[in-house]
Amino acid sequence: ETIQAWYRKRYQVELDTETEILSLQGSQEGLAHVALALCDEGDIVLIPAPSYPIFANGPKIAGAELYEMPMLKEYDYLIQFDAIPEEIAEKAKMMIISYPNNPTGATAPDSFYEELIQFAKAHDIIVIHDTAYSNLVFDGEEGKSFLYYAGAKDIGIEFNSFSKTYGM
């Protein structure tokens, strides 16, 4: 209930304590295990490049194939969904993203999340959002919860971590 209240206050997101909140030893554990739970041998997982190592390692352990989505400075380090080949998008099982991003520090605007949800729904892709750095932003930027956006709960899972924010 404490996490539920925190998400409501911080992100204006309503979560069900019975079906939408799970406490883990850490978000890294969750990121690794979600790939084991959802991916089969040969599934394609879309990951940002560069990215935190567990984004690749979890799916690799599950036997999935990786497709790297470049995060380029010219696009403010936002993934360009139209750059993902259609044949890859159609075969992809899961996409892992992280905003605010590690290692670039980039944040994503509302339009990015809306496009992400539309893209994932169109291609039946499960979105995994790592929002561990949502409270470590600068220059007036704001870390957001992917779950705030309409349709996100239908296609995605979000991992958060208090250890980054509170130095635990």
Language-model features, listed with the residues they occupy:
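Active-site phosphate-binding strand-loop segment of PLP-dependent enzymes
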Residues: L72-K144
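N-terminal small-domain helix-loop-helix segment of the aminotransferase-like
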Residues: E1-G26, H33
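Conserved coil-to-alpha-helix start sites within the AMP-binding
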Residues: S27-L31, S51-F55, Y166
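Active-site PLP attachment segment
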Residues: L147-M168
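A short helix->loop->beta-strand "cap" motif at the edges of active sites that frequently abuts
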Residues: D43, A64, A122-I126, K153-D154
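Short acidic capping loops at alpha-helix termini that bridge into adjacent secondary structure
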Residues: E14-I21, E41-I44, K91, K153-G156
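Conserved PLP-anchoring active-site segment centered on the Schiff-base-forming lysine
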Residues: A37-P59
